[in-house]
A protein has these predicted regions:
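Glycine-rich and small/hydrophobic secondary-structure elements
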Residues: 87-113, 234-285
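Short glycine-rich loop/turn motifs
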Residues: 38, 93, 181-186, 278
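Gly/Pro-rich active-site capping loops and adjacent beta-alpha segments
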Residues: 10, 113-132, 207, 212, ...
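Flexible, low-hydrophobicity surface segments
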Residues: 1-146, 150, 157, 165-168, ...
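Helix-loop-helix junctions that connect adjacent transmembrane helices in secondary transporters/permeases
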Residues: 76, 135-215
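Beta-strand segments within the central parallel beta-sheet cores of soluble alpha/beta enzyme folds
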Residues: 72, 221-227, 255-265, 292-297
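Short acidic loop-to-helix transition motifs that present clustered carboxylates
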Residues: 74-78, 172, 204-205, 229-230, ...
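Alpha-helical support elements that line or immediately flank enzyme active sites
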Residues: 41-70, 105-124, 185-254, 300, ...
């Protein structure tokens, strides 16, 4: 921006600026709903890892006649969202792999009733120790693929010619995307077994594929509309698919429109983050500080499922080299 320009001049040609400034912008949570819409709230696993999952929904179902509680057994198609590896069930079945993983979906006539019912679902099972450290996972062989190697030049010669060789380790922590608009979707069943979904997503085709897979219907019968996003920063690429698919599952099961909007606490616990990394590095330098050689080993913490981890790992390596 030139020094003489004001911020108002700089943004005046952006068509959404006035709408955002005056609060007229519509997001998924602002849209008018069809009559009879149900509201969905996911129930999350209480700990980081476990098995022998058991649910008791009797209190939740007794709260209100409109309450429905869906589990993995209610999925008509495949209980799977993962495409690189089949490691991401839509709803946990028997085992769970992270705190907040969806173990059930509650539907009710309004959001308040759905949230109250979700709190009444009792969860039990055998808790297991989680693996939280990428180095530990690598040592155990618990990895998503074989290690990648990228080389350029003769690093051994560079270290031999260097005046100084420095080694060390570095930790780069995870980070929440913290988009202002949380994950949101509205699913509307249509004639002929079709499903229409409005999703706050950066990747509508991924949402379409996920709904098709879970409902067991052709992609041609699934229409996904991506509305204006209230921020995303990469957090609504593959990450938007589970919530839209859960809404679609509820709509498929009940034959009624279903709206699902995570609150902030749910969004921060239930969604993926920027990858944490551990790294060991070795740098060869001259006396005047010029880098002759650099060698680094990265340990990527990809979390409970692979998602976009491979693409992120490749990008990490390309950025270094």
């Amino acid at each position: 921006m030139k020094a003489a320009e004001s911020y108002a001049d700089y943004y005046k040609d952006r068509p959404e600026s006035l709408l955002n400034l005056t609060g007229q912008t519509s997001y998924v949570d602002d849209l008018p709903l069809p009559e009879g819409t149900l509201f969905a709230v996911p129930v999350g696993a209480p700990s980081a890892r476990g098995r022998s999952l058991q649910l008791d929904a009797r209190e939740a179902l007794a709260l209100d006649p409109s309450v429905r509680v869906l589990t993995a057994r209610d999925i008509p198609g495949e209980n799977q969202l993962g495409y690189v590896l089949p490691d991401e069930p839509l709803i946990a079945d028997g085992e769970w792999s992270y705190k907040g993983e969806v173990v059930a979906l509650v539907l009710a006539r309004d959001r308040s009733t759905a949230r109250r019912a979700a709190r009444l679902v009792r969860i039990s099972g055998e808790e297991l120790p989680p693996v939280l450290d990428a180095r530990e996972a690598f040592a155990r062989g618990d990895i998503i693929m074989q290690p990648l190697h990228l080389e350029s030049g003769d690093v051994d010669r560079a270290f031999a010619e260097a005046d100084f060789v420095v080694t060390g380790s570095c930790e780069s922590d995870g980070q929440e995307h913290l988009y202002l608009e949380t994950q949101a979707a509205i699913a509307i069943p249509e004639d002929g077994g079709r499903m229409y979904c409005i999703s706050s997503t950066q990747g509508p085709t991924g949402v379409q594929k996920a709904i098709s897979r879970v409902l067991g219907i052709p992609m041609a019968q699934v229409e996904v509309e991506a509305r204006r996003l209230g921020g995303a920063f990469g957090g609504k690429e593959d990450q938007a698919a589970p919530w839209a698919t859960l809404a679609a599952l509820g709509a498929w099961y009940t034959g009624r429109p279903v709206k699902l909007v995570l609150n902030r606490a749910e969004d921060m616990v239930m969604t993926g983050k920027r990858h944490p990394y551990s790294s060991d590095f070795k740098i060869g330098l001259t006396k005047d500080g010029r880098i002759l050689g650099f060698e680094v080993t990265y340990y990527q913490n990809s979390g409970a499922c692979i998602d976009l981890s491979l693409a992120i790992l490749w990008r990490t390596m390309f950025h270094v080299c």
